[in-house]
Amino acid sequence: MINELSLKEKRVLFAKLAGIAYRDVKDARHAAKLLGFTKTVLIDIEGAQTYVFTSKTDCAIACRGTEPSEMNDIYADLEIFKADSVSGNKIHQGFKEEVDKVYDEVEKLLDRVAINKDIWACGHSLGGAMATILAQRLEYKDGHDVDTLLIAT
């Protein structure tokens, strides 16, 4: 499904998914279904939220970005110290810690639902940073092939 789209169509799709990541589960499920995704799972742990949308051919991970009313998100944005990534590079500690919260559940879910499917990651703002780190970790640590299209402002 997604691989058949043009780059412009992919950008539009992932911008929509990044926006859907801010919705509640019921609204997100409905919106994702209109885009061709048949299953929607929200992973929400200690203020870090990530949706996994699944279709017949794809799994799209959409990480929720900064919500100004959520102190957890503000704290994550402001925690600018450097941390080690799985590839040996230095990354933003607050963003890494948000991924740490959801990573195990995302990885377990992908092991069940992403067999023979393309995996994509996207997000806006804090969610864009999370998508980048999550995709890197899934590839380096677990051998998943993840395509990443970030929607960031």
Segments from the language model and where they lie:
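Non-catalytic, mobile gating and regulatory segments of ester bond hydrolases
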Residues: 1-122, 126-153
